[in-house]
Amino acid sequence: MPSISGQSSQHLAAKLLAHLCGFAPENLIDQLTSACTRFAEACADLTLGYDLLRRLDEQPNLAGQLSKCWIVSEFSLDHHCRDVKAFLSLIDSGDLHRSYYPLDDSLDQPLEKFLALNSDPSSSADNFSSVYQEQLHNKIDTELGGEKVGCEEVGDKVEEKLLPLLRCYRQREMQRIIWRDLNRLSNMQETTLDLSLLAGSCVDEALTVIHAHMAEQYGQPIGAES
């Protein structure tokens, strides 16, 4: 493993470019070179950068997809550089290549699913967003579940703990959605559905947490004047 130095960072950038340049148009090689250099310099622990190289070797389709993502999406490159560990974790999770809500090419299928849910008294539209809601609920429960705060502290706790947690989760899932969209791993219906359900789940789970803390302080409203 190369030592952690400026030269090693340059070596990492060169190795990344060698893996990715074959998938980039000639007129965009300079942009890809800049992206590889930026990522390598962002790796405070260069071991993480070489971990990415290992994944590129192990997963044949990953290099072409990463090349496109770094060239087209500044958002993705920013976040991959900002938190390399989180990016590697996202790759390892398999979620980049997994559809949460598989859809066919029928334009009316998502609408039909929603209509079916809404017309069935035993069903709820929430079931359709259960993947995001379950993931986010588990994350909130793990990181905030043991905390008890009074009403006067809710604002501070939301600012201090809940909002960063929601932001982190939302950014992870946005990286996944962008990756799948740019690489045509999802169609337009799935992409727009993912965006809608992600937004709705973040709002719903945030309200659930705040409601629980408020109810603990004031009690649960049960009528028009209570």
Model-derived features: positions:
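Non-catalytic regulatory/linker segments of enzymes
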Residues: 1-226
